[in-house]
Amino acid sequence: MAAAATTSSHLLLLSRQQAAASLQCGLSFRRQPGRLAGGSSAPSVRCMAAVDTASAPAATEASKKSSYEITTLTTWLLKQEQAGTIDGEMTIVLASISTACKQIASLVQRAPISNLTGVQGAVNVQGEDQKKLDVVSNEVFSNCLKSSGRTGVIASEEEDVPVAVEESYSGNYIVVFDPLDGSSNIDAAVSTGSIFGIYSPNDECLADIADDQNLDQVEQRCIVSVCQPGSNLLAAGYCMYSSSVIFVLTIGTGVYVFTLDPMYGEFVLTQEKVQIPKAGKIYAFNEGNYALWDDKLKSYMDSLKEPGPSGKPYSARYIGSLVGDFHRTLLYGGIYGYPRDQKSKNGKLRLLYECAPMSFIVEQAGGKGSDGHQRILDIMPTEIHQRVPLYIGSVEEVEKVEKFLA
């Protein structure tokens, strides 16, 4: 009787365990004879994986589409490092830049509250009035790059000359940036942004420098090494401060878009391998300067206003912020242009830290960047704050303006 009870209990317990195991891990069971303590036989269980080929792909697909699965910028950078696309130093530099962008985003959003609107009272090297946020954003960007310990030289729109941030330049990256593009619109809460590009150090810039205020020969060589064509860029991107904070990045393998999640304080991947349309019906030019343009450019602009095969002319969209206008062009197609004119003989935008990074991004997305005659990325800078005309956007649209200007 006791033996029967023991057998019954064992079978009940065994059946419950089998059921639980089957539900939890989808395994199949095969009963084999075994022995109980009393000498009677009892079934034992052999566990084998049961593969349902029909449901496996569906399960994999479901896991990919999980609404709770997110990829942060940090995770994405680590994956790129593991794949050998970038090294550990580049990962740290890009993480530092993203931190700077988060801080600047907060400053921009709170600018009216923190009394950061208006003019600082100083003039930068370009002869432009510095906004309060220009100065603060430049300091934030510079400090984040310095604290990374992986940046050798930085060149900013707000600095007269490149700044050495480490005792030794060997193996450290060169970062060029505009800390706050479109700052003239900040008082009106219009979209602004930060632009950056990352270069590898030049072989001529591999020595320690003396700690003095004057530029010695080594520093001069390092400054020269900053002036590289955009074709040498290793990474480029921008962060747009608007209704959302958008971080756009390329490391030479396509264009990726990350959106700042205010709940977690993390940039989250929202678009991969962005491709700009081959053509577009939107143009972004400051037509207030029309009278200052040459006749060829006027003819081009007039052609955009004529009804095309569809019976509709191009649409004009101009924010006055390079980052804002470029981001729309990247997503919708079309062309953004800031040409030379009678007032600005070489254009207004800076080659090193505005035109080159944006052109690198647009080419990675299948678009084109030109000064009207040649590829932006092929132009060798002769000085840090060199200006060039810029026509950037869909391939067909940029080639169209090049034909008019030829």
UniProtKB/Swiss-Prot annotation:
It catalyses: beta-D-fructose 1,6-bisphosphate + H2O = beta-D-fructose 6-phosphate + phosphate. Mg(2+) 2 binds at residues 157, 178, 180. One of its GO terms (cellular component) is cytosol. Disulfide bonds join 222-227. Gene3D superfamilies: 3.40.190.80, Fructose-1,6-Bisphosphatase, subunit A, domain 1. Its cofactor is Mg(2+). SUPFAM superfamilies: Carbohydrate phosphatase. Residues 1-47 form a transit peptide. Substrate binds at residues 181-184, 286, 318, 336, 338, 348. Induction: Light activation through pH changes, Mg(2+) levels and also by light-modulated reduction of essential disulfide groups via the ferredoxin-thioredoxin f system. GO terms for biological process: fructose 1,6-bisphosphate metabolic process; fructose 6-phosphate metabolic process; fructose metabolic process; gluconeogenesis; reductive pentose-phosphate cycle; sucrose biosynthetic process. Pathway: Carbohydrate biosynthesis; Calvin cycle. Mg(2+) 3 binds at residues 178, 181, 354. Binds 3 Mg(2+) ions per subunit. Its EC number is 3.1.3.11. Mg(2+) 1 binds at residues 128, 157. It comes from the Eukaryota. Inhibited by sodium chloride. In plants there are two FBPase isozymes: one in the cytosol and the other in the chloroplast. Catalyzes the irreversible reaction from fructose-1,6-bisphosphate to fructose-6-phosphate and inorganic phosphate, to regenerate the primary CO(2) acceptor molecule, ribulose-1,5-bisphosphate. Involved in the regulation of photosynthetic performance and sucrose synthesis. Belongs to the FBPase class 1 family. This is Fructose-1,6-bisphosphatase, chloroplastic. It comes from Oryza sativa subsp. indica.
